[in-house]
Amino acid sequence: MGQTLIADIGGSNSRFALAGAAGWPERVLVTENAMVADLETAVARYLQETGARPRAATFAIAGPVLGEEIALTNCAWRFRRAELANRFGFSRLQIVNDFEAIAWALPQLTAAHIRPLGPGALPQEGVKLVLGPGTGLGVAALLPVGRRGYAIASEGGHILFGAHGTDERGVFDRLHEECGTVSAEKVLSGPGLPRLARALHPERGYREPEAVIAGAHRGEAAAQAVTRLFVRLLGRFAGDMALAFKALGGVYIAGSIVCGLGPLLDEAQFRAAFEGHPPHESLLQAVPTFLITSDQPGLIGCAALAQMNELAQAQT
């Protein structure tokens, strides 16, 4: 058995590591995607800096994993599976969706990696759902199958999204003017936060999510109104997805955007929007919600997958 290279390839940043024997990532390095030409260059740089010579690789990709050629949704990178494996001598190359990898990580996470998001019952036996805004909006689920469960990817972040109530109609009208068809990802993502800010306060001209969050932390009323609406919409979307998957095992929110909100993440408002889905309020009241505080759940999931692959290979 040789080393396995693992990677969480996001729209803005990529994390590389080696899968440790205990099923956890080791020797983690982070690459800013804009600073390298393509995935092959990023992989080569990691291998050069660490001196690692992995025989296998498990990558999580922020985009749909279909066919031989794979393209990231919010990054210009694209690659072909066989060419990548041949260039680096991988005897096995496994590619999964980035949020599918996080779903695989859920059984590994402890109290050091998550915290409750609002009150809620204990998780029941059933589907666990993970979602979160980053460069895009990811959604995946872990089905209660076998000892570890079975993760499935989705493209739920691209469902159409709209106003609920008169106070949101003008906002969504302006969102439609700016970006045409409004999907959940157009609003609930890093690029979506300033987009939402421009729709709510067009005179402010917000361009970066960091500017909105920093303004809200400073007490700027306009920015705080944006983050309040963002939290409400995130709670509503999470409730939508929890109903779609009947996620009695709990809903887990990932991503640096939500973690960066800190005290701006009004848990009562989030839960109210999450539960406000008649006639199934009581069902959602029984579904606990959690915030993933670890900054590398995708790598943890890839390491778990690599360990599963090694165990399966040892048994053959």
Predicted regions mapped to residue ranges:
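Fold-independent oxyanion-binding glycine-rich loops
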Residues: I9, I61-A62, D98-F99, P133-T135
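ATP-binding/phosphotransfer module of carbohydrate and carboxylate kinases, centering on a glycine-rich
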Residues: M1-R53, T166, G170-T316
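Conserved phosphate-binding catalytic cores of ATP/NTP-utilizing and phosphoryl-transfer enzymes
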Residues: M1, A44, R92-K128
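Short, glycine/charged-enriched secondary-structure capping and boundary segments
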Residues: G20-A21, L72-C75, L109-A111, P144-R147, ...
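Short beta-strand-loop/turn "lid" adjacent to the catalytic site in phosphate-handling enzymes
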Residues: E49-I95, W104-H113, V130, C259-P263
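Short, acidic Gly/Pro/Ser/Thr-rich loop/turn segments
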Residues: S14, P64-L66, G136-A140, R195, ...
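Glycine-rich phosphate-binding loop of actin/hexokinase-like ATP-binding domains
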Residues: H113-S183, G262, F270-E275, P279-L284
